[in-house]
């Protein structure tokens, strides 16, 4: 793992620096951390609690997904709040749980839509090899990016460091995410 520079650490929040140092000094090339992704399709199931009930231990990492961001009435709408709660669970477990987020980006501008590009008709607007910011599809992309940025800002403001994995299946093969 590359060493964090003093500048990176001075600019980072206290919790971000603590997480980075923990991963660098206690985990890198020494341990494997377990994790559990939360469900975005069924809010009635708490996957972390299921792991704890089955094993008597909490996973080190709890994963969340911005997949359903902005989709009213869908499960997984409260991923940010759940992640903040997981991080703050230190009161019960004696240590913070590590938060990771991914983003299965659904087709921009559609209510629902698929997240695999092969199943959508959406195209990134390009003009002469450059992103066309005047195209309506650009507005849809920007709107989605702004929604995610708002959620990441909530996490930052709550002091929650995030292992961020956006578009982790962008290469098209979920086997290697």
Where in the sequence are the language-model features?
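Substrate-binding cleft of extracellular glycoside hydrolase catalytic domains
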Residues: 71-177
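N-terminal module-boundary/linker segments of secreted carbohydrate-active enzymes
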Residues: 1-85
């Amino acid at each position: 793992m590359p060493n964090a520079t003093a500048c990176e650490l001075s600019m980072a929040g206290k919790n971000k620096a603590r997480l980075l140092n923990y991963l660098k000094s206690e985990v890198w090339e020494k341990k494997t951390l377990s994790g559990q992704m939360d469900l975005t399709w069924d809010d009635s199931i708490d996957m972390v609690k299921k792991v704890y009930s089955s094993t008597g231990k909490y996973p080190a990492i709890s994963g969340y997904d911005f997949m359903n961001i902005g989709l009213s009435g869908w499960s997984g709408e409260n991923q940010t709040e759940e992640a903040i709660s997981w991080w703050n669970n230190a009161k019960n477990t004696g240590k913070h749980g590590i938060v990771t987020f991914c983003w299965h980006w659904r087709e921009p501008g559609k209510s629902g839509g698929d997240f695999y590009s092969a199943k959508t008709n959406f195209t990134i607007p390009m003009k002469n090899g450059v992103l066309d910011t005047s195209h309506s599809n650009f507005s849809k992309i920007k709107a989605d990016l702004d929604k995610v940025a708002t959620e990441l800002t909530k996490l930052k403001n709550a002091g929650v460091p995030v292992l961020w994995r956006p578009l982790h299946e962008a290469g098209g093969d979920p086997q290697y995410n």
